[in-house]
Every structure is written in C-alpha cells, then in structure tokens.
Amino acid sequence: MLEFASLGAFQNHVTQTMIPAVHSHLGRGLEAAAELIQNTARAKLGHYQSSVEHFPAWPELADYTKADRVAKGFTENDPLLRTGALRDSIGHEVHGFEAVIGSTSDVAVFQELGTNKIPPRPFLGPAVVQNEEALRALWHDVLLRGFLGRGSASTTQMTGARLRDGD
C-alpha cells in the first residue's frame, strides 16, 4: 500500500501517475468503442433492419431497384449492399478524446437520412443505440481500471470491442 508524507506528495502521485493512466485508458476505450460501432454499422448492410428507438425500420426495396440489381449482376434483395464499397467506406478516427465514426461515401448520407426519392435506411445511428449496454460496460471497465492503475486484461471482450495491454 502506498503511503504519502504529505498531501502535496499525494497530489504529485495523482498528477504524475493516476491522471496519465486514466488518460491512457480513456484513449484505448474510445478506440474500442469506435471500432465496436463501426463494425456493427458495417454488419447491418445487406440485411433488413427493424426499428430502433427513433430510427425507422428499413422498408422493402422497390421492385425497380430489385430489377436493376439483378440486371447488373447483384443479388436481388440485399439492401445497401452491392459491391461492398459502402460497407468498406465506414470507418472511424480517434484523436485525443474525440472519435468520429462515419462514412467517406456521399451515398451513406442519402441512405442514413433518406431523400425525397429514397426512404431512410439508417445504420450508423442504430449501431450506437444497439450497443448501449456494451458501451456502458466498456466505459465502466475503462474508468475503473484507469483509476485503480490496472492494465486492461487482454481477454476483455465486449461484443467485438477489446482493450489490449500496450495499445
């Protein structure tokens, strides 16, 4: 057990040891959370989705869309999945304590929000909502380990998110 000669010594310990450890764990936790949401969003493409909170269920593809898919050599009824380009455009970036999960494709915006001709088929928003419990557990683990100064267990897995020692 650590003992401190003064409150100043304790403050130095917190400043030099605990705060950097918490920051390190937060960064790794944010990376794991972003990866979890990214992977969930990617997995939605090609499968009809039911409604999630305020996000609507995906409607059936229009007959002309199905015919166009078949004419171009794709399967008839795998919504938002043809070549995999949209799926592969979904990624994430983490900088400090900020994460961005999204797509580099303009098509993603049209599909997520819909247009006057295309009904919304959201996949990014629902990916966050559907992972709420896993994200809570992840953040609990990250904060607890950071405050206690413990490393992350290499086997910690939460539905695809993983914290690894040394990351």
Which residues are covered by each model-predicted region?
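Short, Lys/Arg-rich flexible segments
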Residues: 1-167
